[in-house]
């Protein structure tokens, strides 16, 4: 793995290396590992702190320029894109309702349910989670176990504009209809966001349960109920 990291870091600093077959193979290997859930762009340590593997995120960014546009035919439907679609859902134990789409490079754990929705590459969606109708999971976003992303939810990615930290939704969260969570905001375990809540790094999240109000930015504490 260290050898792959060295290649990615060098290619990030010198984009001319993207023409090299060895570099392309390394990038595609990383995407394949992401697709299988063997590596992650971000992961919690034993204390619950999230560690971002920046070099893996860089590999996701570098994947686009080495890919060629191709026509993808799925029954009567046709797409034209650089990134292949994820496949073999039955083997993965994932329920996918037409017209849900996940890209190659996104990990979906067994028990995930995708209603007509979209999961971008580099994302990690853990077991028991439902991605409801018209919800979108952005590039490299990290979604925990038994999460419900309600209809029309938007979980931001890291690619456009390029973000330092992926958006994180921890285990057992409920994200209400039409919520937007972007810019690397972290939603702690078992938190509930009411419908239409919008969270960015500059959003003031005010805890009024104590004697004095307490303000958070960029993170939602575990077990919180957030509403507008």
Give the positions of each predicted feature.
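Structural signal for interior beta-strand "rungs" in well-ordered beta-sheet cores
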Residues: 94-226
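Terminal amphipathic alpha-helical/low-complexity segments used for targeting or macromolecular assembly
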Residues: 1-95, 217, 223-225
């Amino acid at each position: 793995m260290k050898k792959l990291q060295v290649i990615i870091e060098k290619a990030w600093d010198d984009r001319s290396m993207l023409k090299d077959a060895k570099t392309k193979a390394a990038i595609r290997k990383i995407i394949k590992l992401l697709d299988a859930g063997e590596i992650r762009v971000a992961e919690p340590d034993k204390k619950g702190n999230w560690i971002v593997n920046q070099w893996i995120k860089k590999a996701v960014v570098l994947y686009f320029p080495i890919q060629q546009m191709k026509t993808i035919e799925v029954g009567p439907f046709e797409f034209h894109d650089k990134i292949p679609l994820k496949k073999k859902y039955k083997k993965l134990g994932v329920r996918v309702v037409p017209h849900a789409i996940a890209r190659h490079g996104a990990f979906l754990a067994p028990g995930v349910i995708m209603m007509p929705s979209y999961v971008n590459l580099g994302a990690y969606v853990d077991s028991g989670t439902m991605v409801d109708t018209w919800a979108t999971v952005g590039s490299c976003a990290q979604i925990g176990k038994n999460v419900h992303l309600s209809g029309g939810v938007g979980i931001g990615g890291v690619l456009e504009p390029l973000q330092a930290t992926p958006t994180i939704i921890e285990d057992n969260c409920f994200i209400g209809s039409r919520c937007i969570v972007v810019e690397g905001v972290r939603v702690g375990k078992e938190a509930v966001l009411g419908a239409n809540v919008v969270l960015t790094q500059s959003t003031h999240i005010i805890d009024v349960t104590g004697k004095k109000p307490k303000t958070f930015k960029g993170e939602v504490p575990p077990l919180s109920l957030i509403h507008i």
